[in-house]
Amino acid sequence: MDAVSDGRGAIAAAAMDQRGSLKKALAKAKGGDVSDAMMEEFKGAVTEVLTSHASAILLDPQWGLPASKKRAKDAGLLLAYEESGYDNNKPGRLPGLLPGWSVQRLKAEGANCIKILLYYTPFETREVNEQKHAFIERIGDECQANDIPFFLEPVGYDPTGGDEKGAEYAKIKPEVVKQSMAEFTQDRYGVDVMKVEVPINMKCVEGAKAFGGVRVYSRDEALDHFRAAAAVATKPFIYLSAGVSNAEFTESLELANESGVKFSGVLCGRATWKEGIPVYATQGIEAFRNWL
């Protein structure tokens, strides 16, 4: 854990393990196909520039291993173990592992920690969630057998197919985050650190800078949701940026601080670099480095 923390013991990590979503975004901005070399180059530039300001970088073994060699000497390495995305043809957003990889192999590539993203909601069917519970138990056992910390990233969703960025989902998001934290901080899962979403949608907080016009929570209610989710956790947790803008993520962290919750840091990805995608796609690597 020391390898991915700063001198205060806090985790201030950058995330660059996006795969399918990054490739689509680059292809859209470029107006054409994206090669493996471009994926590696983009990840390498982000790693090289941002790790001088971060305690660690989260990468994937598909396109991120060359980038891992470019990180700052004091920056730790987390490697993703899950397959990107999920199978739309099956219900429940069931998880899968990267073929050809194991915790032992990721550790041999220099990983200080293992990360798993899991789509999870307590409002899913019991049958689906039991499969997910067993899946995480197996990963926890594998990490413990290899003596490496396990970071779990539960990402909530609407099992009825609703928009997770909309106001209706914002009403249930606090409960999704809270129950996910209560479930997976149980010892049987072997999770060392939870990488969690903030338990609210900042665009729905009345009076917030990010407020989008539809009120779901007052400021005091939002603060209470932070406290309620943190209260059920029995393991350390950090907040993820979940693709929102840097300004919105910063405002959510200010709210977390105001609430008094004891979070252990952040893992910030797209909020930091996503606006540079068109720069890289249209102007090339040097322009992107300068933008970063």
Question: What annotation goes with each model-predicted range?
Answer:
Residues 1-9, 128-148, 158-292:
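Expand to "…catalyze enediolate/carbanion chemistry for C-C bond making/breaking, isomerization
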Residues 107-122, 145-164:
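A short mid-domain helix/strand-loop element embedded in enzyme catalytic domains
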Residues 1-126, 190, 214-218, 235-236, ...:
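Alpha/beta catalytic barrel-like cores
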